[in-house]
C-alpha cells in the first residue's frame, strides 16, 4: 500500500511538472499568420558514447500544417545531428519504442538527408546531417500522455530520441 501511495504521489508531481513545462513550450510554438502552419521550439541534447570521446549534438523540433479543406494535420519532426567522424552516419530508418524500451515497430524509412562537412583532418570531419520523419496525427496525439520514444538507425550507430510529455502537451495545446 505504501508503494502505491508513493507511486501515485510521484505520478502526480510529474504531471504537475509536465503541465508547468508544457505551458513554456506552448508559448514558444510559432503559428503562421493564417493559423495553418506550426513550428515547435527546437530542443537540443548532447549524446555521448561510453568513453565520451565523440559527443554528438542532437536537435529536433516538430513542424505541422493543416490542410485548408478537411482540417487534416500533417506532422514531421526535423532532426539535426552534428558530430565528428570519418564518414557521415547515413540515417536510414526510425523505429517506434514502447515503454519497456523495445524498438521494433518501423515508423518510416528515412529518405534523403542533407549532409554538410567542415574542419576536416586526415581522418575525420565535422558533419551536420539534417533529415525529417513524417509522423501521423494519431501517433503523436496518442503519445501525449506517455511521450514518444524513437530509435534512429544509421549505417554506423543507433541513437534514441525522446519527445517528452511536456513537449507534446505544450505543442498540441497550440496545434488544434
Region locations from a protein language model:
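A generic "folded-domain core" signal
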Residues: 1-145, 151-176
